[in-house]
A protein has these predicted regions:
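Short, charged/polar, low-complexity loop and linker segments
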Residues: 106-110, 167-177, 212-214
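Extended intrinsically disordered or low-complexity regions, especially N/C-terminal cytosolic tails and loops
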Residues: 1-120, 186-187, 256
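Flexible secondary-structure boundary motifs
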Residues: 119-185, 199
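Amphipathic, Lys/Arg-enriched alpha-helical patches that create a basic surface
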Residues: 207-256
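Histidine-centered, metal-coordinating catalytic motifs and their short helical/loop contexts
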Residues: 180-208
C-alpha cells in the first residue's frame, strides 16, 4: 500500500510538473507572438521613417500618445466605430497612393500637370486620410471624458458623426491641447488653404507661385510624404491598439 501511494504521488507530481511546463510554454508562446506582432509593426514604422525621412523619436512619441488612449479602456461601441473608421482611412490611403504614384509615372515629363497633381494630392491627403486619422483620435479622446468644444457653433461635440461636420482646425486645436503635437504640427494649414482657395498659380515650367506675394512654393511633395508617412504610422499603431483591446474584451466575456 505504501509503495502504491508513493507511485501515485510520483505520477501526480510528474503530471503537475508537465502541466506547469505546458502552461509556461503556452504563456511564453503567447508572449512571443505578442512581441513578434509588436516588433513587426515597429519594424514597419522604422522602414517608413527611413524612406520618408521622419524622425523615429517623433514616432515613438506619437505611438505613446495613441497607446495612451486605452489607459482607461475602450468601450465596445467606440472600438467598433474606430475599427470602421480605420478601414475607411486604409481605403483612402490606397486612393491617395494611386494618385501620388500617377504624378511620378504618367506626368513626369509634363511639369505643369505634375505640379497641379501634386497640389491636388496634398489637398487630398490633408482633407482625406489625415483628417480621418485626426477624427479617430479626437473621438477616442472624447470617449475618455475629454470634451471637444466647437467655438464656431458654440457647443460641445458628443457624437462621432458630429466630429465630421466641424472644421479640421477645431480638431487640430483639440489634439494639440492633449499633446499630439507630432501629428498636428505636420500639416501646413496655410498651404492647404491656399490650394483650396486657388491662391496659387502653376507656371508652364511647373513652378508653383503664391499669387499675392509672388514667391515660389517649394517642397510640397516632401510635406505631403511626411503627412502620409505619419498617417500610415498612426494606422499601424491604431490597428495594434484596437486588436489588443478586442482581445481583452473577448477574455473578459469568456470569464463572465
Amino acid at each position: 500500500m505504501f509503495a502504491l501511494n508513493k507511485y501515485l504521488t510520483r505520477i501526480k507530481n510528474q503530471a503537475t510538473w508537465r502541466y506547469k511546463r505546458l502552461k509556461c510554454n503556452a504563456r511564453n508562446s503567447s508572449l512571443a507572438v505578442e512581441m513578434t506582432r509588436e516588433l513587426f509593426y515597429i519594424k514597419r514604422q522604422k522602414f517608413l521613417c527611413e524612406k520618408y525621412g521622419v524622425s523615429f523619436d517623433q514616432v515613438e512619441k506619437l505611438n505613446s500618445d495613441i497607446i495612451g488612449l486605452a489607459n482607461n479602456g475602450i468601450k465596445k461601441n467606440t472600438l467598433d466605430l474606430a475599427r470602421l473608421a480605420v478601414k475607411d482611412v486604409q481605403q483612402g490611403m490606397m486612393y491617395w497612393l494611386s494618385i501620388h504614384g500617377l504624378t511620378s509615372r504618367e506626368v513626369k515629363e509634363m511639369p505643369q500637370e505634375k505640379s497641379l497633381l501634386d497640389l491636388f494630392s496634398y489637398l487630398l491627403v490633408v482633407e482625406g486620410i489625415f483628417s480621418k486619422v485626426v477624427q479617430i483620435i479626437a473621438f477616442m479622446l472624447m470617449e475618455n471624458d475629454h470634451d471637444v468644444f466647437d467655438s464656431i457653433r458654440n457647443e460641445f461635440i458628443t457624437e462621432f458623426e458630429e466630429l465630421e461636420k466641424i472644421d479640421l482646425a477645431v480638431k487640430l486645436k483639440f489634439l494639440r491641447k492633449h499633446g499630439f503635437l507630432v501629428l498636428t504640427d505636420s500639416v501646413d494649414r496655410k498651404l492647404r488653404n491656399d490650394i483650396a482657395h486657388l491662391n496659387l498659380a502653376v507656371k508652364p515650367d511647373g513652378k508653383i507661385i503664391d499669387k499675392k506675394s509672388g514667391t515660389e512654393i517649394k517642397n510640397i511633395v516632401e510635406k505631403m510624404d511626411h503627412i502620409g508617412c505619419l498617417c500610415a504610422i498612426s494606422l499601424l499603431t491604431l490597428n495594434y491598439l484596437l486588436d489588443e483591446q478586442e482581445k481583452k474584451m473577448k477574455l473578459t466575456d469568456a470569464k463572465t
